[in-house]
Amino acid sequence: MKLSNLTLFSFILLSFYDVQSDEVIFNDAKSDLELESPYIDVIYDKDKVSEICPKYSIGCYLSKDGGYILISDEIPSNHHDVVLYGLYSDYLQHNNSGLIDEALTCDLKVNYLSENKKHELARLYSGQCDSLFRNKVIVMN
């Protein structure tokens, strides 16, 4: 019985830690963007991600039902915070302007990693940002 109670207590404590850390990441994104919006839930479910989010993505922000974020429960731990930070950034931009600036989100993620002393990941994400958004000419018809 004691082992069962200890296991339950540990599970509750870990669940609280996850929610707490998600809220800290949300507050970091709010502060960096200088935008206000209410906190939205994060659902960790790889099956829902593969069903709802864009193909090959690890997560996405959805605006329906007041907004929420889906993230795979199999996300590598070293990418969790920056992916969640990016999705919160998308939410904050969309909730305040109706638009999402993907280049801004990309740059914010690189800065977030650098500020948190994750320089190797920052270089990886910076290279990805450069390949996706830099030196591109946008032609509008």
Language-model segment annotations:
Residues 22-71, 76-77:
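Auxiliary, metal-adjacent structural segments of Zn-dependent hydrolase domains
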Residues 78-87:
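Short alpha-helical catalytic segment bearing the HExxH-like zincin motif
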Residues 25, 29-32, 97-141:
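Metalloprotease/metallohydrolase-associated module, dominated by Zn2+-dependent proteases
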Residues 87-101:
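Catalytic Zn2+-binding segment of zinc metalloproteases
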Residues 1-21:
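Classical Sec-dependent N-terminal signal peptides that target proteins to the secretory pathway
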